[in-house]
């Protein structure tokens, strides 16, 4: 039986008002029981379409010696650049497993592409593009002999506005993240490459993500994300559930603690939620160095340790002998690992693990070319749809044959050196700059870096277009207050907002970049600002400046960063990106969710991050508190306009559906009745402008006693000028339910639901009601 974290409200009654230093907690025994124990670890069953893989895996495991079983539970060093490596069992024809970073393309190797980042996929709001991007990335991983990609990312979700890794995920919304991770998993695994969906779970800040030692040599443990059962299910678990439903073969447990139990040894999460409630058939791997217990972590549901384990090894055999661990648990750990290998047919026609991943690109090695001409259109389209136009005064864009283009800002040119993305830092203190002055920001920092085949910088693409048009180009990339030619037809200003693994950002804007924009706008009546942003970037200093005629949030488009932008600037492509987060007028509008939690008072050795806001993050919080954003979640402009009409809602069956879903055998993703389609919604959209364009129709639901509105559907449609299209949304039982912590079930609400359809979370011209 599953145990709830709390029947009502917040799970941990921490003494938030009295965190006095004189009562400093020095032992984790203080927190025992806050994450309820769930044992034993359930064995994989082969449910769903896993039956054949489990039959093969069990036959394989039956042939292993105890020593061979143990060697498959942890990584080893290899002569490759694989981030992690499971050693081979030669006598059984098992070649081993290569795992490698990351979710935006391969890092640290040659002959691969640098794809748009997760935040850019989120900005695209495009299911099909997410799938295609995943498939072409998967081809590259496969050619390089990478069995498992360490991604995609849906944790962090984006709770903390300054979160250092928000850019690796898709959106500050569980529904949008869930749809996009589902399509990404399907695309990647269509190429027989395993996915490691990460970081499970509530990994919402980089500050104190790992244990540290203070100046007095006291150990400060990883931050604890203290979260109630309802919030866990309705926000943070939601996209992981979608990933499991899509067939994800691996989940990576995170560095943080959850309700004061380390995520990689949290039996409630691994045994209870993931392997029982969601019916997960794959295996759980640690984030690198995230194992903090030995046999206890195995019993809690951890299957594989990376990059190696100092606590398992022969201790597993000893534990089985003395009864502290069942032999069946060890067998299940290996069965889950091997079932994944068989599930993706990696036992047939898969390249040798790590064959295209030389340990050092500067050493002699065979060139394994993973790029392909067929990927080019998807690379470019992914970059194009990364861009969100949020301001366009008096038709400043598209550009109209400018005679003189002046280009400014440190973000316009390609980095002066490029080393295949090998430089990153896993620290966890806040000391990094929030801008990247070494060139255009095509990707964020850390293990999510990629290794582009080239970088087509904005200035390079602008010069190519200027050559074709006979335009002149002036530039100054270094001056904070540059001279501006009076006859400039347009001034393009390039700035960025940097973020990296290991650090949370210090601010949502920076004075240097703001000064550059203001100084140029003061001397140029047609100033267009392009921001390459690894997360939210506020613009209160210049957003309303009369001479700032257009603003583009370009996010992290990957290697086609310049080519994509120029197509948009000149109207060869239309803007169709939409914001996957809320941009506030002032940073203070994010309230307690602006900054990460810090060690303090009695919890200085056991940092606490209390998710007391519940489900109210990003636009839900702005709606709840009545705060008007600068740019709403889902907002974005186009070169055309759209008109909405004719909203229709129909129930898919007569009668009133039951409050709880019917009982059923658990399949990967959970109770299959959660995904029964209960309601169909349609609306008509007409392109009222003069050019063709893609509109992102968004459906929000107001569930009784819940947030004002929650995203529960979207459809991106291409509509020709003057034409109309009908968009259709299907609402499942889960879409219309809330989590009942008492019953441990998803529950439909009796009463009146509100259904909204429109352009973004604040511009919803169509509204109807639905009664259950």
From Swiss-Prot:
Lineage top rank: taxon: Eukaryota
GO biological process assignments: cellulose catabolic process; glucan catabolic process
Top-tier EC class: hydrolase
Pfam families given in the database record: Fn3-like, Glyco_hydro_3, Glyco_hydro_3_C
Catalytic activity of the protein: Hydrolysis of terminal, non-reducing beta-D-glucosyl residues with release of beta-D-glucose
EC numbers, comma separated: 3.2.1.21
Membrane-spanning parts: none
InterPro entries linked: Cellulose_deg_GH3 (IPR050288), Fn3-like (IPR026891), Glyco_hydro_3_C (IPR002772), Glyco_hydro_3_C_sf (IPR036881), Glyco_hydro_3_N (IPR001764), Glyco_hydro_3_N_sf (IPR036962), Glycoside_hydrolase_SF (IPR017853), Ig-like_fold (IPR013783)
Keyword Secreted: yes
Record carries keyword Hydrolase: yes
Pathway(s): Glycan metabolism; cellulose degradation
UniProt entry keywords in alphabetical sequence: Carbohydrate metabolism, Cellulose degradation, Glycoprotein, Glycosidase, Hydrolase, Polysaccharide degradation, Secreted, Signal
GO cellular component: extracellular region
Any GO MF annotation of the entry: beta-glucosidase activity
Locations listed in the record: Secreted
Residues bearing glycans: 259, 315, 322, 438, 523, 547, 574, 586
Chief site of localization: secreted
Active site: 287
Signal peptide: 1-20
Function: Beta-glucosidases are one of a number of cellulolytic enzymes involved in the degradation of cellulosic biomass. Catalyzes the last step releasing glucose from the inhibitory cellobiose.
Protein family (similarity comment): Belongs to the glycosyl hydrolase 3 family.
Name of this protein: Probable beta-glucosidase M
Organism: Emericella nidulans (strain FGSC A4 / ATCC 38163 / CBS 112.46 / NRRL 194 / M139)
